[in-house]
Regions:
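Conserved Walker A/P-loop ATP-binding site and its immediately adjacent core
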Residues: 14-52, 116-119, 179-180
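Conserved strand-helix element at the start of the C-terminal RecA-like helicase core
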Residues: 33-45, 118, 164-190, 196-197
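Post-DEXD/H (motif II) to motif III coupling segment of the RecA-like Helicase ATP-binding lobe
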Residues: 80-135
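Interdomain hinge/linker at the junction between the two RecA-like core domains of SF2 helicases
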Residues: 116-165
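Conserved segment of the helicase C-terminal RecA-like domain
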Residues: 241, 248-252, 256-284
Length: 304
């Protein structure tokens, strides 16, 4: 019979607010062999191992199932993904969670996005834990908000803006709904003279290598796979080619811009969540962009 006192602590804070740094500081207080970090993101796990070396044990859920390593303190990073992925195509994530926490005295859940439904499910964990504590430093909010958020009239309008960007000015991030669209749009932009990097599900762990070879592409084109984990260069513009319709993922994807507090803008199809946004100013900006586009085309045809 297991009689060890078990505490569960949930720490919510915005993306890019230093949760990984907090783990590093925790390691300075505790002994290295007391901490285990479980990351559902292989790319992030690889990055942490490279950063921390043997100071902190970091594993994906799949790696843990092979090694079965236990520690007094276990930290589950990006815990919201346990609900999204553990309830669908990676059910072993829940098996890992309950088995590890059963033999740990302190269990920490780190996330930037915890929905009401997730909170209700976590409250049911009281059957396993003696105490559940929530440290809320900001949930489902952005630390660095975009300096401009433009709600586009349609996808075609956004694509027109993308295709009229200036090559090599800065790095833009384009989110597509489907992997086939990622590759087809990258081919189209490459044919127009832009440099592009792509990333779809299963490829995030190779993104760091791609960025080493080309650290400042014109466009990074991806599915939601780049909403988490992978370190990206400074992103000045984020384009959404589809309505996200999920606050958690919208927060994570939008937070890829301005990671270090720089200005960035977002052009999307969703009405922004938690941002000061004026529909009239948005309409005026759309009309202004259309006018500039019209003048540009007219000048082009006059020259030809």
């Amino acid at each position: 019979m297991h009689t060890k006192s078990q505490d569960l602590t949930i720490l919510t804070s915005p993306p890019a607010s230093g949760k990984t740094y907090w783990i590093s500081k925790l390691q300075e207080v505790l002994k290295s062999d007391q901490i285990l970090v479980i990351s559902p993101l292989r790319a992030l796990a690889d990055e942490c191992r490279e950063k921390w070396g043997e100071k902190i044990c970091v594993m994906t859920p799949e790696e843990w199932l092979v090694k079965k390593t236990f520690r007094e303190v276990v930290i589950f990073d990006e815990f919201h993904l346990f609900f999204y992925w553990g309830d669908s195509f990676r059910p072993m994530m829940w098996e890992v969670f309950f088995e590890i926490s059963l033999f740990s005295s302190q269990t920490w859940l780190l996330t930037a996005t915890l929905s009401e439904e997730m909170k209700e499910d976590i409250s049911l964990f009281s059957t396993q834990f003696d105490q559940i504590l929530w440290l809320d430093h900001g949930n489902q909010v952005l630390k660095f908000k975009p300096t401009r958020y433009l709600k586009a009239p349609d996808k075609k309008w956004i694509m027109s803006q993308i295709e009229n960007e200036i090559p090599a000015k800065d790095v833009k991030l384009v989110f597509c709904q489907y992997r086939e669209e990622v590759f087809s749009y990258a081919r189209k932009l490459t044919a127009s003279g832009f440099t592009c990097l792509t990333c779809v599900g299963g490829e995030s762990r190779f993104m760091a290598m791609k960025l080493k070879n080309n650290s400042s592409p014109d466009f990074i084109i991806s599915t939601t796979v780049l909403s988490h984990g992978v370190n990206l260069p400074d992103i000045k513009t984020i384009y959404f080619l589809y309505p996200v319709n999920n606050l958690d993922f919208w927060i994570q994807m939008t937070a890829r811009g301005g990671r270090r507090g720089q200005n960035y803008k977002v052009i999307a199809l969703d009405v922004p969540q938690g941002l000061e946004w004026n529909p009239w100013q948005n309409t005026i900006h759309i009309l202004w962009q259309n006018l500039l586009r019209f003048i540009s085309l007219k000048c082009f045809f006059l020259k030809t």
